[in-house]
Amino acid sequence: MTSRLDHTIVIPSSPEQNWARSVSPCTPTRLFGLPPMSISPPSLPSPSRLFEEIGLGQQKNPPSPKSPFSSAAGKTATSKAITENPSRNESSSKRGRPGSSEAKTAGSRKNSKSQETRNKILTGRVAKPTTVSKAKATAASKSKDTSVVKAKAGTKKSKPASQNKKDKLAEEAEAEAKEVADAEGLNLEEALKRRSDWTPPKALSLVSIDEDTPSQGSGTKLSFGDVLRDYHYNRENSSCEPAQPSKEGNPTKRRRLELVEFEVLQERKPIQQKQIKDAVKTRKTKSKPKKQLNTITARVTARYEQIGELEDLFVYNEESSCETSECLKKPTKPKKETAGKQKEPEYIILSPDAATKSLNDQNFLFGTCSQLERDDSPTFFEETQTAIQLSECLTFKKTASTITTASSAMSIATRFTGKKSHWSEAARDFNGAVVQPEIIDMTDSPTVSVALSRLSEVKHDAPKMASLVSSQSVSATNSLVPKDVVTASKPAADVQLASSGPEPNKTELAAGPFRKTASRLPEMPNFNGYTDSELKNQVLSYGFSLRAVRGRKKMIELLDKCWQSKHGNTATAAIVETSSSAAINETVSVSAARHSDTQVSDKLPTRKKKTTPSRLEPKTTSRAGKKKVSEKPLAGKADKPVEKAASPIPASTYNMVDEIEDSEEEIIPSPTRIQIQRQSSSRQTTPAISCLPLGTKSKRSLKSTKSSTYDEATLLELQSSITKAIHLQTRPRRSLGGSSYSPQLTWHEKILLYEPIILEDFAAWLNTEGFALACEDREVGVALVRTWCESRGICCTFRP
């Protein structure tokens, strides 16, 4: 029974052939007209034996390929011969062709098979088993039917030779019939390949594709349309809502994809048409403005663009608030107005001539952002500045007047005083002329009244301050001025007292008690005002050698220590006390000191240093004259404290600050500066050098009085002599002693190299050597040398 599993029945898949048109095959019975050998039907074998013999026969005689016509003819002939005339095969086998030995041995087997399968008709087509399945089938059949095979073998051996010939012929005919059956069109091998490629699903019920109604034989009555509905999109089950139009009414570029349903589409057609109409309206109203080209001119003029009307900017809010169709039609009206406005030129660009004209009409402001920035009230800043300037002018009224009349007023200035400020110097018109600052009368301003009230409070304390100032003047003169000089200076002091007015009398009365206490205490002299030779003499007087003490600073420190050890600390305490009190009322003392310096210096003789025997006496007297110049006004201030000019005068409440000279920054002076210098020199009648701070450098005041006795013609002669002396100087040799007046370079070479000229050294060289080369017998001071340097743009400075 296992052999049945190796055979499969295949449902016919290929179309049936039309046998009426096929050619009938030529068989021996048809060719020779022989009757069939036996008419009696053979006995039917068992089904297991039938399939076993068919498998063995197929293994021995494989089918050979033939042409389609011959195969078709053979198939029809063999089928007829097998079914209708089974007896003819026996007779034909007797007269068969002589075959080989292999055909004779296999003839008896095939004959029996053909007889057994004569009347069997299969409803389907039998597929050929593979070689493996055939081997299994033969092994199973041999094990089960051994008895049948043995019986067959016994019968075969007992058969006679005539019977063997018949069997051979029958087997040959059967083999030909099988070959025709294989080529008949079953194509079993190809059918197996098709089946392996695709196997249809099991059909539970036959469904007619053409009809929509379900078949009667199926249990579940489903049509083909019902089956496809399971795969169809069902709108009822979907939870998506219909697409709502956007708030603006514009259809988006990306639209939702939906399956088309005819019923839903018909319902949506009027809605979509309405939305399209609304979208067209909104597109017309909401047309985007065209992008303009971004140019440099557009960027510059954008900040001056006129802002449009605000009504056009809020059109969108009105549309969103309106819900009816009437509201949507209203905003179209202002759009027409804006379209008309856009035609006008947005930017009005001026021509080059008009642009330059507008620039010329503008007022330029100079200064930093902090200076140009103002508070909420524009008058507050101006009133504050005016009040400060007024208070300074009241405090430094006399000081400012002397600074403007002095010859050196252009080089040294204070921080708070001066007629011209920094911005007034820089203000110029289009022609290059200096613009004079505006003068504003702020006397009625409340801020000025507050400042004046404060100044009145300060004036009440003036007697006390003046009494402290007088103590310093008395103590300074007692230590430095001899008695003979004091008596000689009294007439000059009286002249100054008469012109000073009522203020010096008040200070004189208040300074009485302090005069006696200060005169009793010895005061330490100011060694910083001594010259190098004077310092050396003082050091030698205390018994020190000059080799051990070198340098100006070391000598001053040594002299201070020696004086303190000799006189004690009481004098130093008095100096500190008087110096602190002198800082209160400096303005009166400074102005009086300048007048006394200029008037006393006219009466003093001069002496020069020793260079030649012929000039011995004038030079010796000049040294004494220098000392008397600084001491005589001090003696006058001992009796009249208004004209105080003590050597260590500290800074006042408004410190005098030495600024950097303009000659150091600009080697070649500007034309305006030269013009101002000429005007100041022409106006000058008594060129006093009194604007220097006397407390820091008293040596400057000692040497500055040289130019007080010179008029304009004398100044020009001395300046030409200075120029001649510089050109006549030869290169000096370096001395072994290391004196300060033996530089390696000449003064002319230093000037060419822009090296700062030390005024003290240059003046000393002119008085000792320079004027001798130029045949000049007079001497010059530091102030005149400084004026000469600044007029020629030479960098000069005082000794540090």
From Swiss-Prot:
GO terms for cellular component: Slx1-Slx4 complex. Residues 67-81, 126-141 have a biased composition (Low complexity). GO terms for biological process: DNA recombination; DNA repair; DNA replication. Residues 16-27 have a biased composition (Polar residues). Residues 16-186, 235-255, 590-654 are annotated as: Disordered. Keywords: DNA damage, DNA recombination, DNA repair, Nucleus, Phosphoprotein. Phosphorylated in response to DNA damage. The keyword RNA-binding does not apply. The keyword DNA damage applies. CDD domains: SAP_SLX4. Residues 164-181 have a biased composition (Basic and acidic residues). GO terms for molecular function: 5'-flap endonuclease activity. It is found in: Nucleus. Belongs to the SLX4 family. Forms a heterodimer with slx1. Regulatory subunit of the slx1-slx4 structure-specific endonuclease that resolves DNA secondary structures generated during DNA repair and recombination. Has endonuclease activity towards branched DNA substrates, introducing single-strand cuts in duplex DNA close to junctions with ss-DNA. This is Structure-specific endonuclease subunit slx4. It comes from Talaromyces stipitatus (strain ATCC 10500 / CBS 375.48 / QM 6759 / NRRL 1006). The gene is slx4.
